[in-house]
A protein has these predicted regions:
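Charge-rich, low-complexity N-terminal segments
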Residues: 1-58, 64-107
Length: 107
């Protein structure tokens, strides 16, 4: 019984692969400031992890600013301007559905 519960929580290879692809591209996008997010220096943002939902339509993006300062504010700004991040990401990724991005502070 325990094996079934742990396998239900495990991520599929596809989720892991797409999550890693999104993570790499978001990292490059932030370094190059391609999203043009006002009031934030995206070069100072680190994407630590991306977790995809089973349908690959939503990505939970774990971020931390350099030095771990103002994490909540950084997440708030990224959430507010997530449409700009998605637009920039769409130019980099060739996948069927571009996931909705949910930004979360990494502890």
């Amino acid at each position: 019984m325990m094996g079934n519960q742990s396998s239900l929580r495990a991520y599929s290879q596809r989720q892991l692969r797409v999550g890693e692809l999104v993570k790499q591209n978001l990292g490059e996008l932030f370094i190059r400031n391609e999203a043009k997010i006002p009031s934030i220096n995206s070069k100072l943002i680190t994407v630590t992890e991306v977790r995809m939902t089973p349908d690959l339509k939503t990505a939970r993006v774990y971020v931390i600013p350099l030095g771990g300062v103002d994490t909540k504010e950084t997440v708030r700004i990224l959430t507010e301007y997530s449409h700009l991040v998605r637009k920039a990401l769409s130019k980099r990724l060739d996948i069927k559905f571009l996931p909705k991005l949910t930004f979360v502070e990494d502890n």
